[in-house]
Every structure is written in C-alpha cells, then in structure tokens.
Amino acid sequence: MSTLTRSNVVGVIAGVVRWIGLLCALVLVVHVLLTVGDANPDNGITRFFSTAADPLALAFKSLFTPDNAHLRVLVNYGLAALFWLIVSAVLSRLIRRLA
C-alpha cells in the first residue's frame, strides 16, 4: 500500500497547473492556425476555438492593431499563448519550491 506524501501532492498540483497553461496555449494556437488558414467561420470547430480563445487572450486581444486581420490575430493571440506557457511554468516552479 502506497502512502500519499506531501511531495507527491505538490507534484500533482504543479503538473495540473502546467497542463492547464499548456491547454490554454493550445486553444489559442489552434485559433490562430484556423484564422490565418482562412477556415470557414461558420464551421462548428472554428466557432468553438474562436469562442474559447477570446477570453484566454485577455488584454492581448487588442494589444497590437495592424491593418491586416490575420497578422493581428497571429501577433496578439500568439503573445497570449506565450503568456500562458510562461505563467504556468513559473507558477508550477513556485508551487514546487514553496511547498
């Protein structure tokens, strides 16, 4: 019978934080790919990722305003994806270190 140690619990929590950040970044990247690739906006998959990506983009959604809509999505949502990756990595390390 294995016992659940504090270090195991902390490791799981840190891993969950990391995976959440990765999933947020993945949603944003898929939205960028669908937008830049001119996916049909009426398609259910495209609508799902567009709807899911908007709140994840936070303030990055309108950070840069180039005239080209594809470039705007690529830069702003791409920066938001990087943000989620960095924040989740930092939080994961902090959780492991402080616990």
Spans of model-derived segments:
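Short, charged juxtamembrane terminal tails flanking transmembrane helices
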Residues: 1-6, 95-99
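N-terminal intrinsically disordered, cationic/polar leader segments
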Residues: 2, 7-20, 85
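Hydrophobic alpha-helical segments of integral membrane proteins
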Residues: 16, 45-63, 67
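N-terminal signal-anchor transmembrane alpha helix
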Residues: 17-38
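Alpha-helical membrane-inserting segments
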Residues: 29-33, 60-61, 87, 91, ...
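Membrane-interface elements of multi-pass transporters and channels
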Residues: 36-41, 67, 94-98
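Hydrophobic, lipid-facing residues on alpha-helical transmembrane segments of integral membrane proteins
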Residues: 52, 78-90
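Individual transmembrane alpha-helix segments
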Residues: 66-82
